[in-house]
C-alpha cells in the first residue's frame, strides 16, 4: 500500500505538480498524425491538464500553443491557419508556432504591443505516426535511439485509445506480468486470428499460443532489474524440468512500457494524462521481420472505438460488454476477444484515481512497487534539481539509449539468462532494419534480481 501523500504525488500531473514536472521533462505523445486532416491540420488537444491547439505548419513542422487567445480568451482551435501560424477569428491576432503574437490588426499602426504578448507554445516532433510534444522547461532533450523511433515507418503502426482513469493505473497494468495468466485467458482454444492480436501467436518451439501457455503456467518467477531506460522485467515460467518460458518486458521511464507482441513483433505504449482522471494510451507497434499490414491493423482497432475521441465502444456505460454466458464458455472476463478491453476494464474499474492506501501487494507485484519507488525518487529529484532517469542531456547519451530488448522465448533452464539475449541478437541479425551492427546499453545490465521489487 502507499501513503496517501505518495499516491497524490504519483497521480497528480497538472501544471506545478512534482510528477507533472517529471512527465513534462520528457517528450510526450500529443496526437496521432492521422488525426489532423490535410484540408485543415488543426486540432484541439488536452495534455497534462493543459488545453492546447496542435497545428501543422506549411513548411511541414508542427506548432502546439495555448488554446485560448491572450486578448479576450476565445478558442484558437477555430482559428484561421495561415503561413505564419494561427489567426484568431475575433480580432485577427496572429500567433506563431512558439506562441508569440506577430500581429494585432486592430491596434494603431505604429503599435508594438504585439511584441509583449505571448501564449504558451511547446516544441513538437513527429516520430512514426505520432506527434510528440515537450512541455518542460528549457530545451527539449534529444530523442533516444529506441527501436520505436528508429524503425523504418513501413515496419511500424501507431494507434491510441481513451481510458477513463488516471494514467498510472494504465501504466501499472502494462508492467504487471502475472495478470496475463488470468485476465487474458481463454477457457478453450483461443479462436482469434494471429495477425495483430496480442497473445495469439504461437510461442516459438512450443506449438502453443501464448494466451494458452501463460494461462496454463500461472505462477511465474518475476524478477526486476534496473536498466538505462528504466526497468527490465522478467517473467519466467517452468514448462518442463529442463525448459523455461522467458518473457522479457520493460518500463520505459517515465510513462511507457515495451513488450513483445509475437516472435518478431514488439510494441511501445505510452500512458499520457489528459487530466488526472482520463488518459490516452499511444502505441507504436513495430516488426523486426517484415513491413506491417497497416490496413489490417487499423481496421481491427477502429472496429472497437468511436471517433474522433477514440472512445472504446465497450466502456463503463455498458459494463464493458460483459456477457455472463461468454464468461462461462469462452473467456475469463466475459468481455469479448479484444485483450485491450480486458486491460481497460481492469484499470477503469478501480475508479478514476485508485486509492492505493487500501491495496495489498504481494511478491508478484515486484515491478509495480519498483516503478513507484522510481517515480517517487524522480519527483524528489525534480523538486531539488537532481538528475532524472533515462533523460539524455546530449546526443551521445541519447544514442546510448537503445532497444529496449523485449522477447518471448523458450530456453534451457540452466542457461535462460544468456539464451534470451542470444535469441534477441539473432532476431536483430536477421532483421532488415536492425541488423548485426546494432549494439547498445541493452546488452549489458545487472543480473536479474529481487532487490528492486517487493
Spell out what each predicted region is.
Residues 1-27, 31:
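A boundary/linker detector
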Residues 2-4, 18, 101-113, 298-313:
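Short, charge-rich amphipathic segments
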Residues 12, 32, 80, 184-189:
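A short, aromatic/hydrophobic, helix- or strand-capping loop or linear motif
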Residues 15, 61, 132, 138-438, ...:
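C-terminal catalytic domain of Rieske-type non-heme iron oxygenases
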Residues 16, 32-157, 241-244, 271, ...:
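Rieske [2Fe-2S] iron-sulfur-binding domain
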Residues 24, 118, 125-127, 265, ...:
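A short, structural micro-pattern
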Residues 26-28, 48-50, 120, 229, ...:
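Short beta-strand or tight-loop elements
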Amino acid at each position: 500500500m502507499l501513503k496517501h501523500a505518495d499516491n497524490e504525488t504519483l497521480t497528480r500531473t497538472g501544471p506545478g505538480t512534482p510528477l507533472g514536472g517529471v512527465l513534462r521533462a520528457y517528450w510526450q505523445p500529443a496526437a496521432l498524425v492521422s488525426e489532423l486532416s490535410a484540408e485543415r491540420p488543426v486540432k484541439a488537444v488536452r495534455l497534462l491538464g493543459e488545453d492546447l491547439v496542435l497545428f501543422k505548419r506549411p513548411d511541414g513542422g508542427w506548432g502546439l500553443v495555448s488554446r485560448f487567445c491572450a486578448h479576450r480568451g476565445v478558442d484558437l482551435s477555430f482559428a484561421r491557419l495561415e503561413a505564419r501560424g494561427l489567426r484568431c477569428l475575433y480580432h485577427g491576432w496572429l500567433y506563431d508556432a512558439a506562441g508569440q503574437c506577430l500581429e494585432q490588426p486592430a491596434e494603431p499602426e505604429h503599435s508594438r504591443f504585439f511584441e509583449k504578448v505571448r501564449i504558451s507554445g511547446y516544441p513538437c516532433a513527429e516520430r512514426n505516426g505520432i506527434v510528440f510534444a515537450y512541455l518542460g522547461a528549457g530545451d527539449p532533450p534529444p530523442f533516444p535511439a529506441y527501436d520505436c523511433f528508429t524503425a523504418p515507418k513501413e515496419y511500424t503502426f501507431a494507434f491510441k485509445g481513451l481510458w477513463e482513469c488516471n494514467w498510472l493505473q494504465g501504466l501499472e497494468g502494462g508492467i504487471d506480468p502475472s495478470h496475463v495468466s488470468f485476465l487474458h485467458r481463454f477457457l478453450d482454444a483461443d479462436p482469434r486470428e494471429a495477425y495483430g492480436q496480442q497473445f495469439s501467436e504461437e510461442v516459438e518451439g512450443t506449438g502453443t499460443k501464448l494466451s494458452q501457455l501463460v494461462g496454463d503456467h500461472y505462477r511465474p518467477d518475476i524478477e526486476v532489474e534496473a536498466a538505462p531506460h528504466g526497468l527490465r522485467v522478467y517473467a519466467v515460467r517452468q514448462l518442463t524440468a529442463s525448459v523455461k518460458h522467458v518473457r522479457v518486458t520493460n518500463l520505459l521511464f517515465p510513462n511507457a512500457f515495451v513488450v513483445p507482441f509475437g516472435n518478431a513483433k514488439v510494441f511501445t505504449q505510452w500512458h499520457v494524462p489528459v487530466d488526472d482522471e482520463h488518459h490516452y494510451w499511444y502505441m507504436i507497434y513495430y516488426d523486426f521481420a517484415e513491413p506491417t499490414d497497416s490496413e489490417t491493423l487499423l481496421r481491427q482497432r477502429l472496429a472497437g472505438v468511436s471517433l474522433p475521441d477514440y472512445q472504446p465502444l465497450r466502456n463503463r456505460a455498458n459494463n464493458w460488454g460483459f456477457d455472463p454466458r461468454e464468461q462461462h464458455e469462452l473467456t475469463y472476463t466475459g468481455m469479448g476477444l479484444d485483450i485491450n478491453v480486458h486491460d481497460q476494464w481492469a484499470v477503469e474499474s478501480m475508479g478514476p484515481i485508485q486509492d492505493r492506501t487500501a491495496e495489498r501487494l504481494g511478491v508478484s507485484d515486484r515491478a509495480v512497487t519498483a516503478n513507484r519507488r522510481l517515480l517517487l525518487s524522480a519527483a524528489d529529484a525534480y523538486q531539488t534539481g537532481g538528475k532524472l532517469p533515462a533523460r539524455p542531456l546530449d546526443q551521445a547519451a541519447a544514442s546510448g539509449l537503445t532497444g529496449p530488448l523485449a522477447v518471448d522465448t523458450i530456453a534451457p533452464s540452466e542457461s535462460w539468462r544468456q539464451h534470451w539475449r542470444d535469441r534477441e541478437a539473432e532476431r536483430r541479425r536477421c532483421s532488415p532494419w536492425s541488423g548485426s551492427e546494432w549494439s547498445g546499453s541493452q546488452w549489458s545490465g545487472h543480473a536479474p534480481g529481487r532487490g528492486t521489487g517487493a
